[in-house]
């Protein structure tokens, strides 16, 4: 026994000496300690984070919702009524509270990604479902049965909402959806309706900062390339400082043009037919560019060179799109083609090209309509398969350039803060409008969800705990109307009670005017896609939180430990850097 203890002590001394040598000769690796919370305590702390975040977000809901001012790391504070912007800005010092808040942010982001709006509604629903779920689990309900009940109820509500949705098509209906999502600003709704009318459902509508006090709509018909002329000597209209080419030949080349000899044949083709020439290539190097300018100034050849838009694979795709639109071919080494062998059939053409210092607009390309449609179909398929938001955005832009055009909403205002706040609302309104066109509309102001709660009373369940799960959703569906009314300064419970007493499925509370109206006739409507996505995402994350039994987070590092870690190199003293 003594020998065993002696050996153990000896091994301990050796290990200790080894650790001391190691601490003097090498950096130590520190692992963060973890804190674990269980059961009711864990859920209560997460709920606190959810409630605090939801309280900040819900004040923006409805036509009389308030602004939230957000401090930024640089520049002026941001003023916004956009729910997802408020949610993203919130971080808590308490890590477990932060876990709850982060999951609500996930709901808001998911809803925003799919539907583009409804983030405030999703946040309010998440808070309501999770709060009731926590109470029920604490009272002894089976968490998994609650989750099944919640899931059954959500499926029933979604089916009910889909059966009541109405498709929209007119500009007036589109304007109504945009107006509601822009917090009642009619001008924004009408601007979006005009933009959609101009470019169609598949057209791209972009939002930019305006340079005036007013909102403006600029529509670019045809294909717009975000590249301008390579030299101002190509300008043909001194008044507008643009190069305008009527019925031009278009050379589309994938590589750089380094010598004039390579494009002599193309210049001869243009001169022989007395037609202008547009050159689209990766670049035109100085010698070739100088020769083109001399030909324009002295020989009177109308010519203009621009750089190919995009980079890498995206550039190739853009050039292929341009070739399809203009009826030309992309001259590329990969297919064994070179500029010396170009003939007229390889050149594209269009009705008119306008080139400024920043961009190029190609109108009425001569490409085969069937070929253009096939190209559009390829892009649509790529959009469906893509998992990258960036790639989807670029593909959508390409589709718009080929099929409809591009509309630019220029948002004006008296200050940077005002423009930023308006851009948030316009973005929400635009996304909601697209969602409404896609899946249809429902009576707005939260009443579609409120009346769907009635349908759950007859929903069959397997046991009492599942029934409680259904009741949790029933109660949560009342919160959007309650919150909108409360933000308008009236008692939310009274409004909810009065609406549930009557049978008209379109009757709701107009918080802007303070009266009960037919929501559809009054133009207060919500897109089905927005409401459906908000409810499904909220229920999904709330169910996960309700069935959580443990939370693991990093413990904050103690200052004394940090100091000790820094002193671990004591044996290396005297080495100053």
UniProtKB/Swiss-Prot annotation:
Q: Which InterPro entries match?
A: Chaperonin_Cpn60_CS (IPR018370), Cpn60/GroEL (IPR001844), Cpn60/GroEL/TCP-1 (IPR002423), GroEL-like_apical_dom_sf (IPR027409), GROEL-like_equatorial_sf (IPR027413), TCP-1-like_intermed_sf (IPR027410)
Gene3D superfamilies cross-referenced by the UniProt entry:
GroEL, GroEL-like equatorial domain, TCP-1-like chaperonin intermediate domain
**Assigned GO CC terms:** cytosol; cytosolic ribosome; mitochondrial matrix; mitochondrion; plant-type vacuole
For this chain, one GO molecular function annotation is:
copper ion binding
Give the residues annotated as coiled coil: none
GO BP = Group II intron splicing; mitochondrion organization; protein refolding; response to heat
Q: Where in the cell is it found?
A: Mitochondrion
Entry-linked SUPFAM superfamilies: GroEL apical domain-like, GroEL equatorial domain-like, GroEL-intermediate domain like
User: Where are the Phosphoserine modifications?
Assistant: 151
Give the keywords, sorted: ATP-binding, Chaperone, Mitochondrion, Nucleotide-binding, Phosphoprotein, Stress response, Transit peptide
* Transit peptide start-stop: 1-31
Name the domain of life: Eukaryota
Description of what induces expression? By heat shock.
Report any Pfam family annotated for this entry. Answer: Cpn60_TCP1
Q: Does the keyword Chaperone apply?
A: yes
Q: What broad class describes the main subcellular location of this protein?
A: mitochondrion
* UniProt cross-references to NCBIfam families, sorted A to Z: GroEL, PRK00013.1, PRK12849.1, PRK12850.1, PRK12851.1
What's the family? Belongs to the chaperonin (HSP60) family.
Family annotation (HAMAP family): CH60 (MF_00600)
Function statement: Implicated in mitochondrial protein import and macromolecular assembly. May facilitate the correct folding of imported proteins. May also prevent misfolding and promote the refolding and proper assembly of unfolded polypeptides generated under stress conditions in the mitochondrial matrix.
Descriptive protein name: Chaperonin CPN60, mitochondrial
């Amino acid at each position: 026994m003594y020998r065993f203890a002696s050996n153990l002590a000896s091994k301990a001394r050796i290990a200790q000496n080894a650790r001391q040598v190691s601490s003097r000769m090498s950096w130590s690796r520190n692992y963060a300690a973890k804190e674990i919370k269980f059961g009711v305590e864990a859920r209560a702390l997460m709920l606190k984070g959810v409630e605090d975040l939801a309280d900040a977000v819900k004040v923006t809901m409805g036509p009389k919702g308030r602004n939230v001012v957000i401090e930024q790391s640089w520049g002026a504070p941001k003023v916004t009524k956009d729910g997802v912007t408020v949610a993203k800005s919130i971080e808590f010092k308490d890590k477990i509270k932060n876990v709850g808040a982060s999951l609500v942010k996930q709901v808001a982001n998911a809803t925003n990604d799919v539907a583009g709006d409804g983030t405030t509604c999703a946040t309010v629903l998440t808070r309501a479902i999770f709060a009731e779920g926590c109470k029920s689990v604490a009272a002894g309900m089976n968490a998994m049965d609650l989750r099944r009940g919640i899931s059954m109820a959500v499926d029933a509500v979604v089916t009910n909402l889909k059966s009541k949705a109405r498709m929209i098509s007119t500009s007036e209906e589109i304007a109504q959806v945009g107006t509601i999502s822009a917090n009642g600003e009619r001008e924004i709704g009408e601007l979006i309706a005009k933009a959609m009318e101009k470019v169609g459902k598949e057209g791209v509508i972009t939002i930019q900062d305006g340079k005036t006090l007013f909102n403006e709509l600029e529509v670019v018909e045809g294909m717009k390339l975000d590249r301008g002329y390579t030299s101002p000597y190509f300008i043909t209209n001194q008044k507008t400082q643009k190069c305008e080419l009527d019925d031009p030949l278009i050379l589309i080349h994938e590589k750089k043009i380094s010598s004039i000899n390579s494009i002599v044949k193309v210049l001869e083709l243009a001169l022989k037919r007395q037609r202008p020439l547009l050159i689209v290539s990766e670049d035109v190097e100085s010698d070739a560019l100088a020769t083109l300018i001399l030909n324009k100034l002295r020989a009177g050849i109308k010519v203009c060179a621009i750089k190919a838009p995009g980079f890498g694979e995206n550039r190739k795709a853009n050039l292929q799109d341009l070739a399809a639109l203009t009826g030309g071919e992309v001259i590329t080494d990969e297919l064994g083609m070179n500029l010396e062998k170009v003939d007229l059939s390889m050149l594209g053409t269009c009705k008119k090209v306008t080139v400024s210092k920043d961009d190029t607009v190609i109108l009425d390309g001569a490409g085969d309509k069937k070929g253009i449609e096939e190209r559009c179909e390829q892009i649509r398929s790529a959009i469906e398969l893509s998992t990258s938001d960036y790639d989807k955005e670029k593909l959508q832009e390409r589709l718009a350039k080929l099929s409809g055009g591009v509309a630019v909403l220029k948002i004006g205002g008296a200050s940077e803060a005002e423009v930023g706040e308006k851009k948030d609302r316009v973005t929400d309104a635009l996304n909601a409008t697209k969602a409404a066109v896609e899946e249809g509309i429902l009576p707005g102001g939260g009443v579609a969800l409120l009346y769907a709660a009635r349908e759950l009373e007859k929903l069959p369940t397997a046991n009492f705990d599942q029934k409680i799960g259904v009741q949790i959703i029933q109660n949560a569906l009342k919160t959007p109307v309650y919150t909108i009314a409360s933000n308008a300064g009236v008692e939310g419970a009274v409004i909810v009670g009065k609406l549930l007493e009557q049978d008209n499925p379109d009757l709701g509370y107009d918080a802007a005017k303070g009266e009960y109206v037919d929501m559809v006739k009054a133009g207060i409507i919500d897109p089905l896609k927005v409401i459906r996505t908000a409810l499904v995402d909220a229920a999904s994350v709330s169910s996960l939180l309700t069935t959580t039994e443990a939370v693991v987070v990093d413990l904050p590092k103690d200052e004394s430990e940090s100091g000790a870690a820094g002193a671990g190199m004591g044996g290396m003293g005297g080495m100053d850097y």
